[in-house]
A protein has these predicted regions:
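Mixed-charge, Lys/Arg-rich low-complexity intrinsically disordered regions
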Residues: 1-12
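Structural motif
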Residues: 16-17
Length: 63
């Protein structure tokens, strides 16, 4: 997923590791070398848990 795809996909189904999740948020962080990176907050509908993953690893579900 790209940064520009975050807002249109909030609270929508996305794919991560070949499973469906709900994108519930995104976080911007800075690593120790000063590089900016994004994380996605994904809700696992089956286990009712939240996963924090690399934004690049999330795919939009194109309906």
């Amino acid at each position: 997923m790209e940064i520009k795809e975050i807002i249109p996909n909030l609270n929508r189904t996305v794919i991560y590791n070949d499973s469906e999740y709900t994108l519930t948020g995104s976080t911007v962080r800075k690593d120790v070398q000063g590089r900016i990176f994004y994380q996605a907050e994904l809700l696992d509908k089956n286990k009712n848990s939240v996963c924090i993953v690399r934004l690049e690893d999330v795919k939009c579900l194109n309906l």
